[in-house]
Amino acid sequence: VIGGDECNINEHRFLVALYDGLSGTFLCGG
């Protein structure tokens, strides 16, 4: 997960801009 707590998909899943399925990482837009 990139961005730490800012990327917490449980609390800020609406801020997740992109999900890279190839590397399994979340890219946050917020």
Swiss-Prot record:
Domain Peptidase S1: 1-30
Keywords: Blood coagulation cascade activating toxin, Fibrinogenolytic toxin, Glycoprotein, Hemostasis impairing toxin, Hydrolase, Protease, Secreted, Serine protease, Toxin
Origin species: Lachesis muta rhombeata
Enzyme nomenclature, EC number: 3.4.21.74
Chief place of localization: secreted
Domain of life (superkingdom): Eukaryota
Principal EC category: hydrolase
Quaternary data: Monomer.
Record bears the keyword Secreted: yes
Molecular functions per Gene Ontology: serine-type peptidase activity; toxin activity
Name the UniProt record assigns to this protein: Thrombin-like enzyme LMR-47
Family: Belongs to the peptidase S1 family. Snake venom subfamily.
Subcellular compartments: Secreted
Reactions listed under catalytic activity: Selective cleavage of Arg-|-Xaa bond in fibrinogen, to form fibrin, and release fibrinopeptide A. The specificity of further degradation of fibrinogen varies with species origin of the enzyme
Any single GO CC term annotated in Swiss-Prot or TrEMBL for this entry: extracellular region
PTM: Glycosylated.
Main function: Thrombin-like snake venom serine protease that specifically hydrolyzes the Aalpha chain of fibrinogen (FGA). Exhibits strong N-p-tosyl-L-arginine methyl esterase activity, and hydrolyzes tripeptide nitroanilide derivatives weakly or not at all.
Keyword Cell membrane on entry: no
Reported tissue expression: Expressed by the venom gland.
One GO BP annotation of this record: proteolysis
